[in-house]
Amino acid sequence: MGLLETNQYLHSQLEKSKQDFRDLTEKLLTSQATVYSLAKQLQKYKCEEYKDLIESVLEEEAPFEEGNLAEKRRLATGLGRYDSLIEAQARELTCLRQKIQEGEGVCHLFTQHAKNTIKTFESFIKTTDMTYYQRQRFCELLAQGSQMAERLASKLSTENHHDRKDEEGQESLAARLSMGLQGEEVNEVLEDSLDEKYLTHSSHHDSHRPPSSIASVCDVQDQL
């Protein structure tokens, strides 16, 4: 039997014991009221045989008059009803607390998984043929999923300052990944631009330079 099952079992036993105690208290009040009424009746008949017993009963407080007895029984019944409500709410709060703890653990696991996925994706996208915008979109979706999980964990957790630190770290990771993509894209653009300029310059230079055969003919003519 786990800790939760043991706790629920003990709560049920405690509630049962309290209910039994309330039932016995009500029966005791009824019995005391009955004894008090009988003592009053015997006093009227001046029964000498039970005089000492009657006096001992009547010397006690007289909370068992008809009005007082009804009030006490009403209070006992009301207290019993409120005790039942309190016990039910306590059990419900225990279950909710356990669900919150389980949800918090799941959120932390998902957040860690998202961080690991982003790190793996960061190294993977550098070897693919995806465009810059496709890579950036994937990074944004991964970062958004991780941040939503962290916000949910922050709402469920009582240590919100730790979750805020994790969220800041996640945002910096997403920003670093985005900046890395931008830097890679800029390098690609610069390389393409340099290659294009080099090819253009080479073709332009070659167009103004005569072919080797023509240059040789010109040299022979000059010698003649």
UniProtKB/Swiss-Prot annotation:
PANTHER family: NEUROBLASTOMA BREAKPOINT FAMILY MEMBER 6-LIKE PROTEIN
InterPro entries: NBPF, Olduvai_dom
Species for this entry: Bos taurus (Bovine)
Domain of life: Eukaryota
Pfam family, one: Olduvai
Any coiled-coil regions, as ranges: none
Protein name: NBPF family member NBPF6-like protein
Family according to the record: Belongs to the NBPF family.
